[in-house]
From Swiss-Prot:
[4Fe-4S] cluster 1 binds at C34, C39, C45, S273. It comes from the Bacteria. It is found in: Cytoplasm. It comes from Ehrlichia ruminantium (strain Gardel). Pfam families: LIAS_N (PF16881), Radical_SAM (PF04055). This is Lipoyl synthase. PROSITE patterns: RADICAL_SAM. InterPro entries: Aldolase_TIM, Elp3/MiaA/NifB-like_rSAM, LIAS_N, Lipoyl_synth, rSAM. Belongs to the radical SAM superfamily. Lipoyl synthase family.
Amino acid sequence: MKSKPDWLKVKMPTGSAFYEMRNLMKLHKLNTVCEEAACPNIGECWNKKHATVMILGSTCTRACAFCNVASGIPDKLDPHEPQSLAKAVSSLKLQHVVITSVDRDDLEDGGAGHFVECIEEIRKRDSNVTIEILTPDFLNKHDAIDKIAKAFPDVYNHNVETVPRLYAKIRPKARYFHSLYLLKTIKQKNPRIFTKSGIMVGLGELKEEIYQVMDDLRSADVDFIVIGQYLQPTSKHAVVDRYVTPEEFDHYKYVAYSKGFLMVASGPLVRSSYHAEEDFQRLKKNRAAMYT
């Protein structure tokens, strides 16, 4: 594994708020993608009491080459998880919550109904909490999109992850154009939902391919693009082709804004839910500015 440049080095997580978050997640038996995916920003986010909760168990039915989440035979659904999540959100007095999940190809609706239950339970306790969901692709789950659109999350996020040329190597069980279809259809069914998608760089993609992904996402009416450095979790995962410089990330940000995105987050350590609450407020302001 290649040694990381200085701009990718982060401090070990510490602090009372960090341990409070960890203990609360354990108390409510909740998984977080922060831990399962070994996110480099966990210390910063948890000290701000920001966390991305991972529902539908901790075992994924796929084994993407970039992802550190365990794969195999998935857990049984916890019918109490939506209520446990709502209690945790209330205990932490969160104003914005991000919910993601493993892929659940074994479930008839891919877990879409469980997402809906989580949204409903949180809003029962506090209708002012804003909710962002980061979902799998619900491939061949025909009712999933309708369920999600009707539930009306404030932000709908689904990551395309990489350029289409690399899908066979990096995301072999997914389909690039299905992901675009999913994002576009959610927006068509409920135009008030903000849509968001992310891509990793440093996997061997070309700049021109990144620009094409930007164009494809804008054609799907995606509001917000996230661009971050791929980091190899273990020796068994896809190898980092190169470390993209901060200056290159700034260039991608400039290009993305020029293509019409309402929001762009681009940087070496940027991840899908990094600064999610602050970015949601900026999204609202940027949309409002379009109509003034």
